[in-house]
Amino acid sequence: MSERNSAVLELLNEDDVSRTIARIAHQIIEKTALDSKDADRVMLLGIPSGGVPLARRLAEKIEEFSGVSVDTGAVDITLYRDDLRNKPHRALQPTSIPAGGIDNTTVILVDDVLFSGRTIRAALDALRDVGRPNYIQLAVLVDRGHRQLPIRADYVGKNLPTARAEDVSVMLTEIDGRDAVTLTREDSEGDS
């Protein structure tokens, strides 16, 4: 007979999450040349639920560091998922695109965790129905590997190699009341 126990490890605390968001904001400023007069209009679109508050925080940091205001919004991927047959009853989330739309802009999709790549593929499909940006980039707080699709992030806060059976959770103050990144491991113990 075996018994399963879970071990929860805190990988990033509140200060770590804050520093990581600041680092991603600096990378976005540098890569997009936001402070250049020739720069494309840049917007951050969060993927619900964790990507939305992350996009807002990144926009705040970008403005703090560069003086440039960046529009934020949200893109709902519910109807674009490839696993609707497995879980057909999902709550739709609002999609909010900044005024002026996404045509001829640089859109940075923001999500909390990058895993298989399927969520990002769904977000790309959703964006295609909204408009045609010049560039689409991806910013994630955590990249845990295990891609099933050829997707990679342009901006990564923390690379966390994990086992497929492990669970990475990003907690954000706006949703969970605190900032942290945890890893849950299922440990099996055999009974003799």
From Swiss-Prot:
One Pfam family in the UniProt entry: Pribosyltran
Enzyme Commission number(s) from the entry: 2.4.2.9
Biological process annotations from GO: regulation of DNA-templated transcription
Principal EC category: transferase
Motif PRPP-binding, chain ranges: 107-119
Catalysed transformations (reactions): UMP + diphosphate = 5-phospho-alpha-D-ribose 1-diphosphate + uracil
Matching SUPFAM superfamilies: PRTase-like (SSF53271)
Binding site for substrate: 49-50, 90, 111-119, 144, 168
CDD domains in the cross-refs: PRTases_typeI
Keywords: Glycosyltransferase, Transcription, Transcription regulation, Transferase
Any one Gene Ontology molecular-function term assigned to this protein's record: uracil phosphoribosyltransferase activity
Matching InterPro entries: PRibTrfase_dom, PRTase-like, PyrR, PyrR_bifunctional
Family: Belongs to the purine/pyrimidine phosphoribosyltransferase family. PyrR subfamily.
NCBIfam families, per database record: PRK05205.1-3, PRK05205.1-5
Primary role: Regulates the transcription of the pyrimidine nucleotide (pyr) operon in response to exogenous pyrimidines.
Entry-linked PANTHER family: BIFUNCTIONAL PROTEIN PYRR (PTHR11608:SF0)
Protein name: Bifunctional protein PyrR
Annotated organism of origin: Corynebacterium glutamicum (strain ATCC 13032 / DSM 20300 / JCM 1318 / BCRC 11384 / CCUG 27702 / LMG 3730 / NBRC 12168 / NCIMB 10025 / NRRL B-2784 / 534)
Lineage: Bacteria, Bacillati, Actinomycetota, Actinomycetes, Mycobacteriales
Gene designation: pyrR
